[in-house]
């Protein structure tokens, strides 16, 4: 492992990357192999987006959306996630919610409101955290930092298959356009832009299977 975590803190592996780079799947599989907890930080932004949408708030109303993030009523129970007492696992994966989440993720008030919630997931024996700023902002002292990249066309095809498998209608051209727009927002935002940490291992998963990518992360950890 490349770096030691802060003294007394549970070890963390961060897996950052753009939309549909496979970071969520990889994080869950690595966590399962190690017997660690997993943090899907994107789910918190999507839950904030869904809560704001339920209240009819436009994504441009930064103060109101930040207030929603501050008071977010969520509960994670294994593979299930509950928003205000209702299972929201299916709803937060809809593209409308994802696009809204990408917009509000640029707001400093939203990011600050969710920062400590994310850090609270750090518990023994360890945590695998996936997102966009896990290694740069949320867990800068992580023991291992991975930055997953993949060709945008490959990512759009991957997301299309995921949505169809879940019974959600999807159009590849629309997904490709949305993904390019989301990539631009994520990399160009003023607060915590999407970029690999200076000490991150950049891993291109375009030509790798899920199993090969998981093994590559585990190899980095055990090196």
Curated annotation (Swiss-Prot):
It comes from the Bacteria. ATP binds at residues 17-25. The keyword ATP-binding applies. InterPro entries: Cytidylate_kin (IPR003136), Cytidylate_kinase_dom (IPR011994), P-loop_NTPase (IPR027417). It is found in: Cytoplasm. GO terms for molecular function: ATP binding; CMP kinase activity; dCMP kinase activity. GO terms for biological process: nucleobase-containing small molecule interconversion; pyrimidine nucleotide metabolic process. This is Cytidylate kinase.
């Amino acid at each position: 492992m490349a770096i030691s975590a802060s003294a007394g803190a549970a070890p963390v592996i961060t897996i950052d990357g753009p939309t549909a780079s496979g970071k969520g799947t990889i994080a869950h599989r690595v966590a399962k192999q190690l017997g660690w907890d997993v943090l899907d930080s994107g789910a918190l932004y999507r839950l904030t987006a869904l809560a704001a949408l339920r209240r009819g708030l436009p994504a441009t109303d930064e103060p109101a959306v930040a207030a929603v993030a501050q008071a977010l009523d969520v509960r994670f129970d294994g593979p299930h996630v509950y928003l205000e007492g209702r299972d929201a696992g299916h709803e937060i994966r809809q593209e409308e919610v994802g696009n809204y989440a990408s917009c509000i993720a640029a707001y400093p008030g939203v990011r600050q409101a969710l920062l400590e919630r994310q850090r609270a997931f750090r518990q023994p024996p360890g945590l695998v955290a996936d997102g966009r700023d896990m290694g740069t902002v949320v867990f800068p002292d992580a023991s291992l930092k991975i930055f997953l990249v993949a060709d945008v066309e490959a990512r759009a095809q991957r997301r299309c298959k995921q949505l169809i498998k879940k019974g959600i209608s999807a159009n590849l051209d629309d997904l490709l356009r949305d993904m390019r727009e989301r990539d631009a927002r994520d990399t160009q935002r003023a607060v915590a832009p999407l970029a690999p940490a200076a000490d991150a291992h950049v891993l291109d998963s375009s030509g790798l299977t899920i199993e090969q990518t998981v093994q590559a992360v585990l190899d980095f950890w055990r090196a």
